[in-house]
Every structure is written in structure tokens, then in C-alpha cells.
Amino acid sequence: MLSTEMKLTLGLVTAFVSISIPAGAAPKDWPQWRGPNRDGLSAEKGLLKQWPSDGPPLAWRVKGPGRGMSSVATANGVVYTVGVRNKGSGGVWVTAFSPKNGEELWSAFAFNGSDVNGAPTVDGNRLYLVGIAGELVCLDATTGAPVWKKSYHSDFPGSPKPGWGFSEAPLVDGDRLICIPGAPDAGIVALNKATGAVIWKTAVPHQGGGHAGAGYTGVVISQGAGVKQYVTLMGHGLVGVRASDGQFLWGYKRVANGTASIPTPIVRGDHVFASSGYGTGAALLKLEKAGDGVKATEVYFLPGNTVQNHHGGMVLIGDHVYLGSGHNNGLPTCVEFLTGKVAWGPERGPGTKSAAIVAADGHLYFRFEDGIMGLIEASPKGYNLKGSFKLASVSGPSWPHPVVSDGRLYIRDQDNLLCYDVRAK
């Protein structure tokens, strides 16, 4: 999800993992970044288990989302995405499309900007979006009308803009909106989702790795060590803060790098799995109670020449993590979650360079940077490609993450939005 050099559960959900699904979301919806639970997993069933040689049917293709690396969200019977449009005074626009035929339902100006990376978060009748310069807006999800707005730059002074811009998708948790300005006294903030008022803000100590401020991902929720906490990979390390008041709990620097820490961490029970590229690697941490706080202990660390996820995400299905491994590579790889043992991979795969992945109905949907889609069986027994095809539109690096919702595979490609029918007939 970045720019030129890089522009950047199906499985078990244990009783220890706290899930925050946006209000009004139906099981078929994908209302936010990485899906209902921010884990890249769709609950869809009845999907194709093998693709035809030319791929699943293209249901529709439309122009109009605008430029950018934003993925899509589905909710309220609508497909939402965000882009820079040459419309009116230009700038960043949110556009709503019909999932049935791609008809544009409405579009609304969000803010001035030259690019956009983050996906929208839809919560009932509200939509939230962060721009690359730290613009934060809340819009009416039925019309696009503005509700409230903030600016990381002016409301949280000292927020250092990441090299390719802010790229998070804010998290809705109950009545709160959780964001990552990365400022010295507001590394992570909780806002009233209805008004934008600050509930708490917390200083996050620099962990000694990477760079100051935000990374390129959002927040996930963990109940590790019996404490509800917000976990994210910031520019300088992996961190956890207490959800109730923002109290800093723990940090870990080895998975941060000096350029861009991007993948969304995976949480399950008392464990957190994280990875980043640029030769960095991957790690599993165990969270344990320590007095009134929480301590994070490294279970294992895998060097970058074994496993590293540049960007494109990772999914945990059963006891295994599936990802595209390698810097500027998306080589399909399977790793045992609790041990770090590589079950299989890295495999060459049908496409080249980085890959964005999600999972549905026992299969991995790999979108490679060169515009090739691959369907791979999600099994630790071995690599099994079940079909691949070239996307109908390839306008540059194919970095926006795929979305599987209501039997449809959505692909954003700059000013194109593609919808494939992946239902089994």
C-alpha cells in the first residue's frame, strides 16, 4: 500500500480473542480493512474450489474510483472505495457502487489530497477514512455527507508523516474510534466515534527499531494475558496499549525496520505474530500478566532469509500462518504458528513480486503485483495451486488487497474496480 519504489475466522477464534465487528455488519460483509475481524478471513462458503483456465467469470468492471491504493469495504448492500478523482476541484473522493452491477450510487468529496492508501471503515451509517497527510474524516455512509473531521497535523502536533503517508484504516471498537497519529504524546488515540472528541491519547515510547511515529497498518484487538489491548506495528516496533485508558503495556522492536513496517499483526489467545520486509523477518510473542501490566516474551524469531512479509498481509488458519514471503516477493509460504517451523514454501507461485492475500472457504486468494490472481489450497500438507488468471485490468503494481464478500471477489486497480463471481454453481 505505498508509492513508486513500493507504494505501498476461517480458522479458530478462541475465547481469548476479542472481536470488534462494525455495527450493522452482516456475515457476508467486509466492512473494514482485512475483513470483519481484521484477520483477512472471510466466513464465505460455497465458493469455487477450482478456477477455470481463464479464471472465474468477470461479473462487471467499472471506471471511476480514482487513483490510489485503497482497497474496498462492503456493507449496507454497497461497495465503498476511495481514490483521487479529477472531478470538481479534484482531491480524494469516496464512491459507493452497487454490488450487483457496479452502478455508481453516489460519490462524495472527502478532503484535498494527491494520493490515498488506507481503506475505508464502515460502521452502520458512518464511514471513517484516514488520508496520507493525516486527514481523518467521518462521513455519512448512505450519502457521503460530512459528519466531522480532524487532522493529525493540527490536532495531534508532532505526528511525523511516514515516508509514503499515513496508510491506516481506523478501528471502530464500541463507541470508540482508534487511530494512530504517532505523535510524541498521542502515539495512539481513542476518539468518540460520533463526535471525534478525544477520549484518551497515549505516548508510546520509541522501541528502538525502525523510525518514529506510525507504521503502515492499523490496530487489532487482543485479550492477551487477560487484558483487553490494542496492538499495532508502529514505525519503531510492535506495541500494545490497554484499551480502557491507553496505558502503554509492552513493546518489541525486532520486527520493525527503518523503511516501512507494513503487515497487520495476527493475534490469537496470548500470542501475537508479526512480520515485516526489508530483510527483517517474523516473530511470535507471548503476552503474560506482570503486576498491573503485561509483558511480551519472544517465543521465536525467524530471520528474513527464512520468512518475511513485505506487504500484502498474512492469515492464520487452524495452526498455520499463510503468507507471501520475501522482500518485494510474495512467495507462497506456510509456517506453524506456535513453533515457527516452515511447513512448506517458499514456492514460486503463478505470479511475481509482492502478493496480497485473503482467505475464504479453505482457500487462499493471492493477488500478485504483476496482476496475476492465484487460488491456493489452505493446507499445511503442501502447496496446491487450484487455478490462476490475469486480471482484466492491470494499471501498475497490484497492491490493493482483494476482498471476498457475498460470493464476489473485488479487485481495485487504480481507476478500475473489478468484480468476479466466485460462487460454486
Regions found by a protein language model. Name each.
Residues 23-425:
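Noncatalytic, solvent-exposed loop/strand surfaces
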Residues 1-11:
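Bacterial N-terminal signal peptides that target proteins for export
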Residues 9-20:
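Bacterial N-terminal signal peptides
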